[in-house]
Structures are given as structure tokens and as C-alpha cells.
Amino acid sequence: MKNAAELWHNVLSVIEEEQRTPKASYDMWLKSTEGVTLNGTTLIVSAPAAFTVTWLERQYLSLLEDTVEEVTGSRLDIQFIEEGQAKHMLDRQNEEVEVMEVAPAKTKAQKTPKSSDELVMSELGQLNEKYTFDTFVIGSGNRFAHAASLAVAEAPAKAYNPLFIYGGVGLGKTHLMHAIGQYVQDQKLGTKIAYVSSEQFTNDFINSIRDNKTVQFRNKYRNIDVLLIDDIQFLAGKEQTQEEFFHTFNALHNDQKQIIISSDRPPKEIPTLEDRLRSRFEWGLITDITPPDLETRIAILRKKANAEQLDVSNEVMLYIASQIDTNIRELEGALTRVIAYANLVGRTIDPNVAAEALHNIMPASEPRKVTIRDIQESVSKHFNLPFDDLKAKKRTKSIAFPRQIAMYLSREMTESSLPKIGEEFGGRDHTTVIHAHEKISTLVKSDGETGKVIEQIKHELKHS
């Protein structure tokens, strides 16, 4: 504990002396933090209040972890907790120290090794205790996904298997996955639950091949009761990993084990995903989450304010909810910014303060970035084509020309690489994208009608 305190003191000294953050910000957010304990590769740090914890996680985590690495020479994870939690943690550690002082020393033979189940679970990620069904705000955009998740939690491998949840970033997919895991864990003691991202699954698989431990890898992932795998779209293009996940999926499904999957898009729209995997994802239930409406956004803000015992008026919540209309993470982040700003300037939180906070503390909002999917949807709508035709293998002129326009716009309006654009159009080769771009570029110069179509679609994309 002394080491953690000294380490954190040194980290703060570096930041303050080298002015890595403005003095006012340092005094407001960092000065009152303290190193609590070092738990393995995780440094526990206390902060005065819940909103401070949230602010530090959002705004300073990268700076602090980089500085810790600079001071110690090792990369440590930082976990922020409230002062009350820190006190409880220290009291508990002190009790353990007292017991250890009066108890006879144990020999190595007396140590109880972790069971294989405990080892597997510790290696496969932890559930976030904040993400439960009780803390999930239900609205029109997520009602069905919530109901399906609860049904799966109440009857794993009996209701819908697999359950596939898709939707944009920050809309609550991960929350529901953790809620399922927490519910099953509470209701069915001893159930083996694993929550992993597709990236972790991929890395574990690669490491198992490198270390010649594929048998252990398979035992780890196939001897569980509930598998929650996040962001499955990142398996796209990874043929060997897809092969391994296919067999993992089959093993679990055949053993009547529950599988829950999340993605930013439905299975049929994940590029270069093997058909056999896509078909298995469609065995169970596919449900989406859409951006919350105004009433739901206000309810989300109210729940967060109540959870952190903050007094925020309905007028302020209405203002914030009116400004942030797509992403729950940004919505909650905006509330945190408003509270932080009010504390910093010593004013009561009202709509005027909220407006100042979101104007001054949040960076000026950049124009929304156009995505390849946005372009595909606009082109489909403009030419009155089914969306899937742009990705299909059809080469008729009525489809090939709009597809080439969409590829051209993807090259002009996004930062995506040629292979990435090709992937999003049914797994086409990058040379196809180059050909499409060259052809439409020539037509724009020589054919006035093509130029008008391009400008019209661009205008719609920029003002949608």
C-alpha cells in the first residue's frame, strides 16, 4: 500500500512539474487522488466522488497510464474507485494482515491451488457489476432486445440459442451481455460464464498456436456453460479464427450451452464472414438496438444522476438529452461534463451552465463522419435498389453502375483502405475498387448527368 501511494505521488509529481495538464485541471481532478494498492498489474487509485471517477476514466486514463509506465518502466492498468470503496478495501486488507500475523505460517503444501474452473474464469474476463438488468433503461429502441436477453438469462440454452444482438456503438449491447451473465451467475451458482471480445478470442487462439497449446485453448473455451462474445464483426477476414470459432460454437451448441453474440451489424452484413458461421448465427434470435428516443435519453440521465446522488433538474436533463441524440456513452459523458464544469466554476447546475459546459469543455462537434454503410444506403435509395444488391455478385448494368458509384464515393468520402472498401462490397478485390473509381472519375468529367448524381448523393450524405 505504501508502494502504491509513493508510486502515485511520483506520477502526479511528473505531471505537475512538466505541466502535462493545465494547473486548474490538475488541481480540480488529479490533486485529490491517492494510490491505494497495487494488485498484480493493476494500480488502484481513489478519487473523491463517482463523477470524478468517471471523468478521470474518460479524460485522463491514457495520460496517467503512459506516465505510470514512464515512472515504473512497466505498463500497469489503472482502476479508479471512490474514497469510500478505498477505505473499505484498506480496512479489509488490514484485517487480513492481522489474521496472518497470528496464524501459523502455511507451507507450500498447505496452499490450496485454484481449481481449473477458477483458472478458466479468471482468464476469460470479468463481468462488470454495474451492468445489470436493474440499471438498464428500457425504451422503444431496445425493448425487444432487453426482453430477449432476460428470457435467455432466465432459461439459458432453452429460449434463444444463440442470441445475436446488433446495433451501433454505445447503445447498450455490452450492458445487456453483462446483465445476462450477472443474472445467470446470481441465479445458478456454479455456472461457468465467459465474457470475451472477439479480439481476445483471436489473440488467445494465435497464442495457443504459437505456444503449441491448442488443446488447452479448446478446453478453456468449450468447457463453459455460457459464452458471451462481443464485437463478433472483428472476426471478418480471419479465416483460421473463424474456423476455430465455428468448431467452438458447434461444441457448445451441441452440449446445450448458451451463446450470446454482439455485433455492430446483422450477420448477413458482416463482410467476409463464412456462410456456415452466418447460418449458425441465424439459428437462434437476432435482435437489434436502435438509438434512444428523447424520453429514453432523459430516463437514462435521470437514472445516472440518481445512482450518483446528484441533484440535476429536469430542465438540465432535457437540454442535455436534446443535444446528444445517438450514443448513450456520449449522453452520460455529457452529464459528467456538466457536473464537472459546475463544480469547477462553483455554480449551480442550470440550463445555462449546461450550455456553457457542453460548449466550452466538449470539443466543438466535428461534422459526422460518413461511413461506407451510409454511402451504400444513400446509393440504394437513390437508384431504388435493394441494399443487398450492392454487395451481391450480380453484374447487370442496373446494379453494377450504382455499385461503382458507391465504391467511388467510398474512396472519396471515407478514409477506408481499398481492401476495406472491397470487403464492404461483398468481399471484392481492391483492384475492382480501383477500376470503379477510375471509371466514375472519367464519367464525372465527361458526363454531366453522372456528375449531377454524384453531387446530389454527396449533398444528401453531408446533410442527413
From Swiss-Prot:
SUPFAM superfamilies: P-loop containing nucleoside triphosphate hydrolases, TrpR-like. Oligomerizes as a right-handed, spiral filament on DNA at oriC. One of its GO terms (cellular component) is cytoplasm. Residues 343-464 are annotated as: Domain IV, binds dsDNA. It comes from Exiguobacterium sibiricum (strain DSM 17290 / CCUG 55495 / CIP 109462 / JCM 13490 / 255-15). Plays an essential role in the initiation and regulation of chromosomal replication. ATP-DnaA binds to the origin of replication (oriC) to initiate formation of the DNA replication initiation complex once per cell cycle. Binds the DnaA box (a 9 base pair repeat at the origin) and separates the double-stranded (ds)DNA. Forms a right-handed helical filament on oriC DNA; dsDNA binds to the exterior of the filament while single-stranded (ss)DNA is stabiized in the filament's interior. The keyword Nucleotide-binding applies. Residues 1-82 are annotated as: Domain I, interacts with DnaA modulators. Domain I is involved in oligomerization and binding regulators, domain II is flexibile and of varying length in different bacteria, domain III forms the AAA+ region, while domain IV binds dsDNA. Residues 82-125 are annotated as: Domain II. Keywords: ATP-binding, Cytoplasm, DNA replication, DNA-binding, Lipid-binding, Nucleotide-binding. It comes from the Bacteria. Residues 126-342 are annotated as: Domain III, AAA+ region. PROSITE patterns: DNAA. Pfam families: Bac_DnaA, Bac_DnaA_C, DnaA_N. This is Chromosomal replication initiator protein DnaA.
